[in-house]
Each structure stands twice: as structure tokens, then as C-alpha cells.
A protein has these predicted regions:
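Sec-dependent signal peptide cleavage junction
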Residues: 3-19
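Substrate-binding cleft of extracellular glycoside hydrolase catalytic domains
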Residues: 15-125
Length: 125
């Protein structure tokens, strides 16, 4: 298993419009989102967790996004091998996101993404 502890750039393109952001999780050191926003980063994708386990820095990372005024989305690393496990993951995500403050929900303008990297899962899609 490879664990990346650096910030992962994320970009989005549409109709000659370009925005850039980062992907963060518990594997990153503290991230100064205010500084990154000043450098031109528009958004951050925050790892919610994996399967039904919360990322240890999820709430801290969300609060940092709120404090910096940076828009964000979240992603869940999937370990689901069947529809029942996928439902467990979805219910976990919904339950966790329902606890966010109104201020955090207002800044969550990017999607809830499903991160599927395991070949034994993605090959069955």
C-alpha cells in the first residue's frame, strides 16, 4: 500500500475555465488553507473516510476550510464489494455530513465523490 502524505493537486476544466484545488486527508500534516487560497487554489476535496470509518482529521479539515472561507467537497474511499456494503458507505456519508454546521454546509459547494482505486473493486464496475 502506498500512502501519499503530500498535497495532491486537483484541477477542473470546462469551457476554457480552469480552477485548481487540493485533496487532503489525515495523511497530510496541518494544511494552511488560507495560504493556499491566497496562492490561487479555489477548493479542497476532504477525505470523509473509508468504508464506515471516519478520517481522523475530517472535522479539523472541514473547520480549516470554514475558517479560510474555501469551498470544499468530500470523498469517501470505497471498500464496497457489493450493493449492501455500498449502502453502508452511503449511509455513513449521509450520517456524517448531516452533523456539519450550517456554515460548513454553505461552503460545501463541491460534490461527495466516491474514490475507487482498488483494482479488485473497479474491475467489477
Amino acid at each position: 500500500m502506498i500512502i501519499c502524505s503530500t498535497l495532491i493537486p486537483v484541477s477542473a476544466y470546462a469551457d476554457n475555465y480552469y480552477i485548481s484545488g487540493i485533496d487532503i486527508s489525515e495523511h497530510n500534516e496541518s494544511v494552511d488553507l488560507s495560504s493556499l487560497k491566497a496562492q490561487g487554489y479555489s477548493f479542497v476535496m476532504i477525505r470523509l473516510g473509508y468504508f464506515n470509518h471516519l478520517d481522523n482529521k475530517f472535522y479539523e479539515n472541514v473547520q480549516n476550510a470554514v475558517n479560510s472561507g474555501m469551498n470544499f467537497g468530500v470523498y469517501l474511499y470505497s471498500y464496497a464489494f457489493n450493493s449492501s456494503e455500498a449502502q453502508t458507505e452511503a449511509e455513513f456519508a449521509i450520517s456524517t455530513l448531516s452533523t456539519l454546521s450550517a456554515q460548513a454546509k454553505a461552503l460545501m459547494t463541491y460534490p461527495v465523490a466516491y474514490d475507487i482505486e482498488d483494482n479488485s473493486i473497479s474491475s467489477k464496475l
